[in-house]
From Swiss-Prot:
Gene3D superfamilies for the chain: Ribonuclease Z/Hydroxyacylglutathione hydrolase-like (3.60.15.10)
A molecular-function term among this protein's GO annotations: hydrolase activity
UniProt keyword list: Hydrolase
High-level lineage: Bacteria, Pseudomonadati, Pseudomonadota, Alphaproteobacteria, Hyphomicrobiales
Protein name per its UniProtKB record: UPF0173 metal-dependent hydrolase RHE_CH01853
Family: Belongs to the UPF0173 family.
Cross-referenced PANTHER family: UPF0173 METAL-DEPENDENT HYDROLASE MJ1163, UPF0173 METAL-DEPENDENT HYDROLASE MJ1163-RELATED
Protein source organism: Rhizobium etli (strain ATCC 51251 / DSM 11541 / JCM 21823 / NBRC 15573 / CFN 42)
Cited InterPro entries: Metallo-B-lactamas (IPR001279), RibonucZ/Hydroxyglut_hydro (IPR036866), UPF0173 (IPR022877), UPF0173_UPF0282_UlaG_hydrolase (IPR050114)
One Pfam family named in its UniProt record: Lactamase_B_2
Amino acid sequence: MKITWLGHSAFRIETSKSKILLDPFLSHNASFSGQDIKDVSAGITHILLTHGHGDHVGDTVALAKETGAVVLANADLAAWLGSKGVDRIEMGNTGGTVTFGGFSATFTNALHSSAQITEDGVSHALGNANGLMLHFDDEASIFAMGDTDIFSDMALINELHQPDIGFVPIGDRFTMGGAVAALACQRYFSFKTAIPCHYGTFPIIDQTADKFVAGMEGSKTQARAMKPAESLSI
């Protein structure tokens, strides 16, 4: 398995059977600057979305049309994507699992909102925000928390799924901050590796992973703060 952080909450996940983009906010992502969208989207089979905000949906519509990748989203967001011309869509909702060739994705709770703002400035809700629990055939498992605060039922997610790797939002203001995210990882999860995300993109969120890394000191979990475009082989 190869994991590449594309900045913000966008990741590319490559396995022997799948090439996945998670929350592909790319063209307006300052952290993605210098990377090539065609390169990171080459050969993708699936696009996975945690919720409907623009900094997560990002380039999904264009990429889905260009690549033919299957898009996974909650039911309300899936309907919105369909109205934009995306025709290869799998939908689900909190607690549900969708199985693909080579991996499955389970929608978990997340404490956040999910919406798109239309041209007339009105915010339209697009279902609940979710985390995505990804189980791969003969590969490490990944829990992409999405945008969220800490919550005690994270313990149940860990009990049910035992994820090996966590994608953890740490930027504060719109999600939990680094210190709280570290507490969530240490109290509720048994990750082998925790990768911080959702930081450094906009001036109003934390610019570094320092608080998270400091909070993870002494943990059995490796806190791996990656640079945009950096890859990690598992």
